[in-house]
Amino acid sequence: MESRPALSPNWPAGELEGVWRWSPDPQRRREAALLLASADRDGAAGQGNWLAAQGWGPDPLAAVALKREALRRELEAGREKALPLWRTLLRRFPDQPASADALYALGRQRPEWRQELLRRFPAHPAALAAALEAGPGEAERRLGTLHLARWGPRWPGAGEAITALCSNRTLSPSSLAQLAQGLAEAGDGQGALRCLGDQGGEGPIGEALSDRGRLALGRTWLKGTPDAQAKASRTLLKVVERRPDGPEAEEAVRLLSERDSADVPALLRSLPPRWRNSAPVQARLALTESGVSSTLAVLRRWPQDPASWDLQWEAARRALLAGDWEGVVTILQTLPAEQLPPALAARHRFWLGYAQRELGQEEEAILTWKGLLVHHPGGYYGWRASARLGKEDLSPRGGPSGQALQASHSRWEPLASGERALDQLWRLGQPTEAWESWRVRRGGQPPTTSADLLVEGRLRQGVGDDWTGLSQLEKASLILPPERCGHLPRLERALHPLRFLDAFAPEAERHQLALPLLLGVTKQESRFTPAVQSSAGAVGLMQLMPETAAELAGGPLTLQRLRDPHLNVKLGAQYLSNLLDQWKGDPLAAVASYNAGPGAVQGWKTPDRARFPELWVEAIPYPETRLYVKKVLGNAWSYQRERTPAC
């Protein structure tokens, strides 16, 4: 049979409708119907026209069509009218993720089906919603909250429910330990500590923690106060001592090695020999020693370990700030860029070229930077290499319009997960179904490999969760193996989505700001999530402090108003434009001021910014601001125009 091009969201609606009406292949007609329904702008009624009678046959797509039709009927005719469709879906496809929604809907009348939902599809969003709604009795609510703590502690409303149940000290130690672990996995270290009780994890509740629970607590407490960090060290050390050969021990050792405290070297030297002689421990100890011999030994022994990659950069940064350019070259050449994840290889190549130029090796520097622009043309180091070579530069004012950016980002791209069913759902414009299938398959476990991070990050973007999705894509870029560089173009595009252009484009034009710079700031500030509020009180897309916003607006604003994307962007663009004016158009100082404040930037005793901009950035005394400047301006450079990396 003649092969036909696969249907996808890239097909024009008119052509899809032609397939839906006239194709002799019923499967192809159903695929067209799903695509048309996903893009239908006429609401539920239009979707019904496309999907009517598409629930035939044993193919899992029939389950999706039945679910969509049942949801449409609920919306149009009420829940009662949809019940026959839900029953049909559950009877014909009991093991398909779509049946979780059937159990949820049918469970409104028969609570035992809600329990069946929690048992069969524990990580499915429908199960998490059912767990949050569990009741009316206290026992049902307790079981629902414990389910959330185990399977979905980040589900909206789960944190409040878990915190409330933690106050019930009649629960068993194992139940309280599960609740504390859930809060830790959701990032609430203080709440987890309160849940553990007065003994803070040292008593019966702490003993009931699993190693995974201790890892979650340690990971969260390491981000807290010095006391919390010390508690994290004790908790992580217990993981290593209890099961030194267990799968959690390695991550515990890595987390212990990352803590920035004077007592860490002694603690690491007390570990069992297996871990004392591991890459993360030896890399951390090498940073405490004078000279570079220990550093070079670690790089040669463990070239593929992330701890070696971090060590190489920390040692090279110390050398470049000291002006030891021969030392920089030695450190960087010991572990070549070709062995690093592409995002780290870009940094490696830039500073190798910089050191070569400082040593008078002009031709070598030019070749190094040209190679960087071939393999890593986007991001901060792509910008700096381009500027150093006298090529294109970053434009803080002007630049491409919203329409031009939209045209370059408009095409749908395959998920390329390697799983046929998942890729098919994505291709047919069903990101929610794809995401739910992924959750069910993985049991809600967080991804750890670059491949899984890339897939889950894009799936989360597909369901509107840029906050977590972009974070996962960033992590994927930092551990992507060099041999998987073919994924880079897709990853780069996913890392730079276009959001809220109707808010950004007019303000960029009004203030003569580069739209890519506005997008770059916002991506780093909030990951395009309007509801975000920082621990310091910054609010909305561009993370404005209420006091700053009130000054810009000419009066106080409620938090609700400040979360409005259009108002937030209007005030944020005005503030950024003011900073650019204050710093005479210098994007480095303006962006640093957006993060740390112009007063702080004014007081830094750093290298001459005009002559040594890259050294000025590396000498910023605040690590957060140092990273922020590179991220924001790298984002802006990548948004300025599409830059396709090569393997």
Regions found by a protein language model. Name each.
Residues 12, 44-46, 82, 192, ...:
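Single-residue signature of alpha-solenoid repeat helices
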Residues 251, 265, 270, 279-284, ...:
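Catalytic glycan-binding domains that act on GlcNAc-containing polysaccharides
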Residues 15, 47-49, 85, 113, ...:
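Alpha-helical solenoid repeat scaffolds, predominantly canonical TPR units
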Residues 40, 73-74, 110, 183, ...:
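Residue at a conserved register position within TPR or TPR-like alpha-solenoid repeats
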Residues 118-125, 135-136, 142-152, 240-241, ...:
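TPR/TPR-like (Sel1-like) alpha-helical repeat modules
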Residues 18, 88, 116, 198, ...:
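The canonical alpha-helical register within tetratricopeptide repeats
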Residues 44, 77, 187, 225-227, ...:
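Residue-level detector of the short coil/turn that links helix A to helix B
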Residues 1-2, 9-13, 23-33, 43-46, ...:
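Generic helix N-cap/helix-start motif at coil->alpha-helix transitions
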